[in-house]
Protein backbone atom coordinates (compact mmCIF):
# COMPACT_ATOMS: atom_id res chain seq x y z
CA UNK A 1 0.00 0.00 0.00
CA UNK A 2 1.31 3.43 -0.92
CA UNK A 3 1.74 6.09 1.70
CA UNK A 4 -0.55 9.08 1.36
CA UNK A 5 -0.91 12.35 3.20
CA UNK A 6 -4.15 14.24 3.67
CA UNK A 7 -3.06 17.80 3.03
CA UNK A 8 -6.39 19.59 3.05
CA UNK A 9 -10.03 19.04 3.86
CA UNK A 10 -13.29 20.69 2.99
CA UNK A 11 -16.96 19.87 2.89
CA UNK A 12 -20.38 21.06 1.90
CA UNK A 13 -23.24 19.97 4.12
CA UNK A 14 -26.81 21.08 4.78
CA UNK A 15 -26.59 24.49 6.44
CA UNK A 16 -22.78 24.39 6.38
CA UNK A 17 -20.31 25.37 3.67
CA UNK A 18 -17.21 24.56 5.75
CA UNK A 19 -16.22 21.70 8.07
CA UNK A 20 -16.11 24.22 10.94
CA UNK A 21 -19.71 25.31 10.34
CA UNK A 22 -20.73 21.66 10.11
CA UNK A 23 -19.02 20.86 13.42
CA UNK A 24 -20.62 23.86 15.12
CA UNK A 25 -24.04 22.73 13.88
CA UNK A 26 -23.43 19.21 15.18
CA UNK A 27 -22.25 20.44 18.57
CA UNK A 28 -25.23 22.75 18.96
CA UNK A 29 -27.62 19.92 18.08
CA UNK A 30 -29.18 21.67 15.10
CA UNK A 31 -31.39 19.50 12.91
CA UNK A 32 -30.63 20.61 9.37
CA UNK A 33 -32.71 17.93 7.70
CA UNK A 34 -35.92 18.67 5.87
CA UNK A 35 -38.47 17.13 3.57
CA UNK A 36 -37.58 16.72 -0.11
CA UNK A 37 -39.08 19.24 -2.49
CA UNK A 38 -39.64 19.28 -6.22
CA UNK A 39 -36.59 21.55 -6.49
CA UNK A 40 -34.48 18.82 -4.84
CA UNK A 41 -35.66 15.94 -7.04
CA UNK A 42 -36.75 17.70 -10.22
CA UNK A 43 -40.17 16.11 -9.88
CA UNK A 44 -42.76 15.84 -7.13
CA UNK A 45 -41.04 13.72 -4.41
CA UNK A 46 -44.27 11.75 -3.97
CA UNK A 47 -43.33 9.94 -7.20
CA UNK A 48 -40.47 8.25 -5.33
CA UNK A 49 -42.22 7.74 -1.98
CA UNK A 50 -43.78 4.63 -0.50
CA UNK A 51 -44.36 4.34 3.27
CA UNK A 52 -43.11 0.74 3.41
CA UNK A 53 -39.38 0.05 3.52
CA UNK A 54 -38.07 -2.23 0.80
CA UNK A 55 -40.42 -1.33 -2.05
CA UNK A 56 -38.35 -1.42 -5.25
CA UNK A 57 -37.48 1.99 -6.75
CA UNK A 58 -39.09 3.86 -3.85
CA UNK A 59 -37.86 5.58 -0.71
CA UNK A 60 -39.76 5.25 2.56
CA UNK A 61 -38.68 8.65 3.87
CA UNK A 62 -38.47 12.00 2.16
CA UNK A 63 -36.56 13.54 5.07
CA UNK A 64 -32.93 14.18 4.25
CA UNK A 65 -30.04 16.55 4.52
CA UNK A 66 -30.50 18.72 1.44
CA UNK A 67 -28.11 21.50 0.46
CA UNK A 68 -30.35 24.41 -0.38
CA UNK A 69 -28.80 27.77 0.40
CA UNK A 70 -25.37 27.33 -1.19
CA UNK A 71 -24.47 29.88 -3.88
CA UNK A 72 -21.69 28.78 -6.24
CA UNK A 73 -19.27 31.48 -7.41
CA UNK A 74 -18.10 30.35 -10.88
CA UNK A 75 -15.17 32.78 -10.97
CA UNK A 76 -11.55 31.72 -10.43
CA UNK A 77 -11.57 28.28 -12.05
CA UNK A 78 -9.73 27.16 -15.18
CA UNK A 79 -13.03 27.10 -17.09
CA UNK A 80 -15.21 29.96 -18.32
CA UNK A 81 -17.44 31.30 -15.54
CA UNK A 82 -20.48 31.37 -17.84
CA UNK A 83 -20.00 27.68 -18.58
CA UNK A 84 -19.65 26.74 -14.90
CA UNK A 85 -22.67 28.83 -13.94
CA UNK A 86 -24.84 26.69 -16.26
CA UNK A 87 -23.68 23.37 -14.83
CA UNK A 88 -25.66 21.21 -12.45
CA UNK A 89 -24.99 21.63 -8.75
CA UNK A 90 -23.49 18.12 -8.74
CA UNK A 91 -20.63 19.56 -10.82
CA UNK A 92 -20.43 22.87 -8.98
CA UNK A 93 -20.31 21.38 -5.48
CA UNK A 94 -17.17 19.25 -6.05
CA UNK A 95 -15.40 22.16 -7.73
CA UNK A 96 -16.11 24.35 -4.71
CA UNK A 97 -15.11 21.66 -2.20
CA UNK A 98 -11.89 20.78 -4.06
CA UNK A 99 -10.88 24.44 -4.30
CA UNK A 100 -11.54 24.95 -0.57
CA UNK A 101 -9.55 21.80 0.32
CA UNK A 102 -6.62 23.11 -1.72
CA UNK A 103 -6.85 26.45 0.05
CA UNK A 104 -6.96 24.59 3.38
CA UNK A 105 -3.81 22.69 2.40
CA UNK A 106 -1.81 25.86 1.85
CA UNK A 107 -0.83 24.61 -1.61
CA UNK A 108 -3.55 26.29 -3.65
CA UNK A 109 -2.12 27.27 -7.06
CA UNK A 110 1.26 25.60 -6.38
CA UNK A 111 1.38 23.47 -9.52
CA UNK A 112 4.55 21.51 -8.63
CA UNK A 113 2.91 20.19 -5.46
CA UNK A 114 -0.55 19.74 -6.95
CA UNK A 115 0.81 17.62 -9.82
CA UNK A 116 1.33 14.88 -7.21
CA UNK A 117 -2.09 15.24 -5.60
CA UNK A 118 -5.30 13.29 -5.94
CA UNK A 119 -8.84 13.83 -4.82
CA UNK A 120 -11.37 11.69 -2.97
CA UNK A 121 -15.01 12.77 -3.18
CA UNK A 122 -18.18 11.48 -1.60
CA UNK A 123 -21.70 12.38 -2.65
CA UNK A 124 -25.15 11.34 -1.49
CA UNK A 125 -27.16 13.69 -3.65
CA UNK A 126 -29.36 11.64 -5.96
CA UNK A 127 -31.78 12.18 -7.48
CA UNK A 128 -31.43 15.82 -8.45
CA UNK A 129 -33.51 17.96 -10.75
CA UNK A 130 -30.88 17.72 -13.48
CA UNK A 131 -30.35 13.98 -13.11
CA UNK A 132 -34.10 13.49 -13.39
CA UNK A 133 -34.26 15.59 -16.57
CA UNK A 134 -31.32 13.72 -18.11
CA UNK A 135 -32.64 10.26 -17.26
CA UNK A 136 -36.41 10.73 -17.63
CA UNK A 137 -36.38 9.53 -21.24
CA UNK A 138 -34.29 6.48 -20.27
CA UNK A 139 -36.78 5.61 -17.51
CA UNK A 140 -39.71 6.13 -19.87
CA UNK A 141 -38.21 3.97 -22.65
CA UNK A 142 -37.23 1.21 -20.24
CA UNK A 143 -40.65 1.21 -18.62
CA UNK A 144 -42.43 1.19 -21.99
CA UNK A 145 -40.33 -1.74 -23.21
CA UNK A 146 -40.92 -3.70 -20.00
CA UNK A 147 -44.66 -3.07 -20.16
CA UNK A 148 -44.84 -4.09 -23.82
CA UNK A 149 -43.07 -7.37 -22.96
CA UNK A 150 -45.43 -8.03 -20.07
CA UNK A 151 -48.50 -7.34 -22.20
CA UNK A 152 -47.51 -9.70 -25.03
Which residues does each PLM region occupy?
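Cys-dependent condensing catalytic cores that perform Claisen condensation/acyl-transfer
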Residues: 1-152
Amino acid sequence: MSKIAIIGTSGLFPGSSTPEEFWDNLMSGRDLTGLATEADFGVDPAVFFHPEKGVVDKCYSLRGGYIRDFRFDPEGYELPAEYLARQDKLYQWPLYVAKEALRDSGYYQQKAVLDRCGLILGNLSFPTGSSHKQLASVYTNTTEQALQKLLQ
